[in-house]
Amino acid sequence: MTKYKKKPVVIDAWQFTKENYKKGVPHWIKRSNRKVDLWSQYGGDVIGGEIKTLEGNYTVSENDYIIKGVKGEIYPCKPDVFEMTYEKVME
């Protein structure tokens, strides 16, 4: 089996938490060419969402990261996978 490693690319990401949702969804998510539907219920006690892509619909759960890929694609990523794959970039 041939092994590969991920190329070092810089992405935009935002963690979907109650606190972050109350502060506001980033413009790059709002303006994406994909349908991103994020919502809250019961006064903000429950949050969730869905991202519609060409490959299908993805559920967004609390604490998931929403990522903008290298080609502008928007998709969710579970926190454990995100933290194993990405590290914060100092600007």
Q: Language-model features: where?
A:
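N-terminal domain-onset segments
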Residues: 1-54
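Short, compact, well-ordered microdomains
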Residues: 55-91
